[in-house]
């Protein structure tokens, strides 16, 4: 590895919506610069996780260093820092953008700008990045590069007269992209003499070497064997291994300002090396850390329980291992009378929750029951103290609480004009407040609503997709807490409250939710030998109730004569048996019943 001057380094990332061809473009860049040998090349080279490949999304960041000889005959080093495109991971996106000087904005020429792309473009503009628009998939018969270019100009305000037309799949326009990165993306600042500072944009846990930290050197230089300090956590380590990523790790002895690389230093957990933290040298520390570090706060919570109680220890191990890789995941032990022992887990958002659950089931072979997701409520008690509640069964009793506040988000939806009515209806039904509506082009519209997060965490995204036939996209951000008239809805089966089915709902909706839920449970809970009542209650007031009729054996089958007293005797005997069974019998609530809460149509 030759030492490249700072003026010939280019750091860039790719911003694109899911399915607009980001991973394929990254593949082509790696291929054409000869970074990855032809025989090792596979589709979506940078998406390492099976889950990423299957869902076609990028979850964890990757980075790759490419050597490229430009038309001017100079040799350049291009560092591609890949970003996840989903709204749940927007903090990771912002950190990886902070490590770059430029970004390729990849837009599908047959579809146009989507909400997620917009959100990430705004992040890139905040970080003062040079943005190069690329119209991808121009080989498709449905491609309309002119329309999409006009849309980008209209929506983002970028000049698209020079937009590169490309097709990553067919390999068209890839050289133009490489040239424009060299020409347009500014080189990093030459700050070799400053004290060493580097920005962590990703970290993951390796079973043999501990945590591997991916970082971009902002100032100064660092050598193997140096003692480093992480400024946010204050932890200190000695670098055992230093290297660059060409996607595989290649060891080097020194990295300087502008370069991107990785280090290993026998770090035990990812929490010690948080994304966004600043690395400096213990011997000559920097005065202040790089700006922009925040701790990722979980927004959505749910209970995870093993279906088999013997798997509790395995679930604990699996969560510990995932936590090593995922600093945003939080969990604590929880017991439930209905489900036994399990964990209450916190996630960044819905996609994050689904991915964690899938990884637990897939990579650790666990069979899990999940409770309905809930958000963090702020409850002010009568003593004036503020309690954060993320589990409905822990809500203080009505006598002890003064008010409940819930998190609100601002949702921006981009949709073809035809579906505006359907989406407005959806938002109204979820207690949404209309804020703004903008027309981008004649056919595409942005709708802006403020909604309670609790109304979005269950199935809002699925509903959005189904009502717009898959064309709408959404992006959300937290805007703070607001007071609302919220109540706790308890579900009782056979007279016993089932804590895993308890939920916090708005008083106006409580009756409908209670009705819908009891009806749904009536279908899902199997019949028993005795009659099972299912009730929905607020406090001591029952607001909805259903009964599952008993299975009964025909005890009169043997009676042929018309003697009524004989029949009565048998029926009384049966009734007594049922009564005794009801007193001591337990009701099995199947897994589907717990998931029913998610599938409720709040209409």
UniProtKB/Swiss-Prot annotation:
<keyword id="KW-0472">Membrane</keyword>
<comment type="similarity">
    <text>Belongs to the TRAFAC class translation factor GTPase superfamily. Classic translation factor GTPase family. LepA subfamily.</text>
</comment>
<keyword id="KW-0648">Protein biosynthesis</keyword>
<dbReference type="GO" id="GO:0005886">
    <property type="term" value="C:plasma membrane"/>
</dbReference>
<dbReference type="InterPro" id="IPR027518">
    <property type="entry name" value="GUFP"/>
</dbReference>
<dbReference type="InterPro" id="IPR006297">
    <property type="entry name" value="EF-4"/>
</dbReference>
<dbReference type="InterPro" id="IPR038363">
    <property type="entry name" value="LepA_C_sf"/>
</dbReference>
<dbReference type="GO" id="GO:0005525">
    <property type="term" value="F:GTP binding"/>
</dbReference>
<dbReference type="InterPro" id="IPR000640">
    <property type="entry name" value="EFG_V-like"/>
</dbReference>
<dbReference type="Pfam" id="PF00009">
    <property type="entry name" value="GTP_EFTU"/>
</dbReference>
<dbReference type="InterPro" id="IPR000795">
    <property type="entry name" value="T_Tr_GTP-bd_dom"/>
</dbReference>
<feature type="binding site">
    <location>
        <begin position="19"/>
        <end position="24"/>
    </location>
    <ligand>
        <name>GTP</name>
    </ligand>
</feature>
<dbReference type="InterPro" id="IPR004161">
    <property type="entry name" value="EFTu-like_2"/>
</dbReference>
<feature type="domain" description="tr-type G">
    <location>
        <begin position="7"/>
        <end position="189"/>
    </location>
</feature>
<feature type="binding site">
    <location>
        <begin position="136"/>
        <end position="139"/>
    </location>
    <ligand>
        <name>GTP</name>
    </ligand>
</feature>
<dbReference type="InterPro" id="IPR005225">
    <property type="entry name" value="Small_GTP-bd"/>
</dbReference>
<dbReference type="Pfam" id="PF00679">
    <property type="entry name" value="EFG_C"/>
</dbReference>
<dbReference type="Pfam" id="PF06421">
    <property type="entry name" value="LepA_C"/>
</dbReference>
<dbReference type="InterPro" id="IPR031157">
    <property type="entry name" value="G_TR_CS"/>
</dbReference>
<dbReference type="InterPro" id="IPR027417">
    <property type="entry name" value="P-loop_NTPase"/>
</dbReference>
<keyword id="KW-0547">Nucleotide-binding</keyword>
<protein>
    <recommendedName>
        <fullName>Elongation factor 4</fullName>
        <ecNumber>3.6.5.n1</ecNumber>
    </recommendedName>
</protein>
<comment type="function">
    <text>Required for accurate and efficient protein synthesis under certain stress conditions. May act as a fidelity factor of the translation reaction, by catalyzing a one-codon backward translocation of tRNAs on improperly translocated ribosomes. Back-translocation proceeds from a post-translocation (POST) complex to a pre-translocation (PRE) complex, thus giving elongation factor G a second chance to translocate the tRNAs correctly. Binds to ribosomes in a GTP-dependent manner.</text>
</comment>
<dbReference type="InterPro" id="IPR035654">
    <property type="entry name" value="LepA_IV"/>
</dbReference>
<keyword id="KW-0997">Cell inner membrane</keyword>
<dbReference type="InterPro" id="IPR009000">
    <property type="entry name" value="Transl_B-barrel_sf"/>
</dbReference>
<keyword id="KW-0342">GTP-binding</keyword>
<dbReference type="InterPro" id="IPR013842">
    <property type="entry name" value="LepA_CTD"/>
</dbReference>
<dbReference type="InterPro" id="IPR035647">
    <property type="entry name" value="EFG_III/V"/>
</dbReference>
<dbReference type="GO" id="GO:0045727">
    <property type="term" value="P:positive regulation of translation"/>
</dbReference>
<dbReference type="Pfam" id="PF03144">
    <property type="entry name" value="GTP_EFTU_D2"/>
</dbReference>
<dbReference type="GO" id="GO:0043022">
    <property type="term" value="F:ribosome binding"/>
</dbReference>
<keyword id="KW-0378">Hydrolase</keyword>
<keyword id="KW-1003">Cell membrane</keyword>
<dbReference type="GO" id="GO:0003924">
    <property type="term" value="F:GTPase activity"/>
</dbReference>
<dbReference type="GO" id="GO:0006412">
    <property type="term" value="P:translation"/>
</dbReference>
């Amino acid at each position: 590895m030759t030492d490249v001057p700072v003026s010939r380094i280019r750091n860039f990332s790719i911003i694109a919506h899911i399915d607009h061809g980001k991973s394929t473009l990254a593949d082509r860049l790696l291929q054409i610069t000869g970074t990855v040998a032809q025989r090792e090349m596979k589709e979506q080279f940078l998406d390492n996780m099976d889950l990423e490949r299957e869902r076609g999304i990028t979850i964890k960041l990757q980075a790759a260093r490419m050597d490229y000889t430009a038309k001017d005959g100079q040799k350049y080093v291009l560092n591609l820092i890949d970003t996840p495109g989903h709204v749940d991971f927007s903090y990771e996106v912002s950190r990886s953008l902070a490590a770059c000087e430029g970004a390729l904005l990849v837009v599908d020429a047959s579809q146009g700008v989507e909400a997620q792309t917009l959100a990430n473009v705004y992040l890139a503009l905040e970080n003062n990045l040079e943005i190069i628009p690329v119209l991808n998939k121009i080989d498709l018969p449905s491609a309309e590069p002119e329309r999409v270019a006009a849309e980008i100009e209209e929506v983002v305000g970028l000049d698209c007269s020079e937009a590169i037309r490309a097709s990553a799949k067919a390999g068209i326009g890839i050289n133009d992209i490489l040239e424009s990165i060299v020409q347009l993306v500014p080189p990093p600042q030459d700050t070799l003499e400053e004290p060493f500072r580097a920005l962590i944009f990703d970290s993951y846990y390796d079973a043999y070497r501990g945590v591997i930290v991916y970082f971009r050197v902002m100032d100064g230089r660092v050598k193997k064997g140096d003692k480093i300090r992480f400024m946010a956590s204050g932890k200190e380590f000695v670098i055992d291994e230093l290297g660059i990523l060409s996607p595989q790790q290649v060891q080097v002895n020194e990295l300087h300002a502008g370069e991107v690389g990785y280090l290993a230093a026998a770090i035990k957990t990812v929490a010690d090396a948080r994304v966004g933290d600043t690395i400096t040298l213990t011997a000559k520390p920097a005065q202040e850390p790089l700006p922009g570090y925040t701790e990722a706060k979980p927004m959505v919570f749910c209970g995870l329980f093993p279906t088999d109680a013997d798997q509790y220890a395995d679930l604990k191990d699996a969560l510990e291992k995932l936590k090593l890789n995922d600093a945003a995941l939080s969990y604590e032990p929880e017991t439930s009378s209905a489900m036994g022992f399990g964990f209450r887990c916190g996630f960044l958002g819905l996609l994050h929750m689904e991915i964690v659950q899938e990884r637990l089931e897939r990579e650790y072979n666990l069979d899990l029951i999940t409770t309905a997701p809930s958000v963090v409520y702020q409850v002010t008690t009568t003593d004036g103290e503020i309690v954060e509640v993320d589990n409905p069964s822990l809500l203080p009793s009505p006598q002890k609480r003064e008010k409940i506040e819930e998190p609100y988000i601002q949702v921006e939806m981009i949709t073809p004009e035809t579906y505006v009515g359907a989406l407005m209806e959806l938002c109204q039904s979820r207690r949404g407040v209309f804020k703004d509506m903008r027309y981008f082009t004649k056919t595409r519209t942005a709708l802006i609503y403020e909604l309670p997060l609790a109304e979005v965490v269950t199935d809002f995204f699925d509903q959005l997709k189904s009502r717009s036939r898959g064309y709408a996209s959404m992006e959300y951000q937290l805007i703070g807490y607001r007071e609302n008239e919220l109540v706790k809805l308890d579900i009782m089966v056979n007279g016993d409250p089932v804590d895993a089915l308890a939920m916090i709902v708005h008083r106006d909706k409580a009756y409908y939710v209670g009705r819908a839920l009891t009806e749904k449970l009536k279908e899902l809970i199997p019949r028993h030998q005795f009659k099972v009542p299912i009730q929905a209650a607020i406090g001591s007031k029952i607001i909805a109730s259903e009964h599952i009729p008993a299975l009964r054996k025909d005890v009169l089958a043997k009676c042929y004569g018309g003697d009524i007293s004989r029949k009565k005797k048998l029926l009384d005997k049966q009734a007594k048996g049922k009564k005794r069974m009801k007193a001591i019998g337990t009701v099995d609530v199947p897994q589907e019943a717990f998931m029913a809460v998610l599938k409720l149509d709040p209409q």
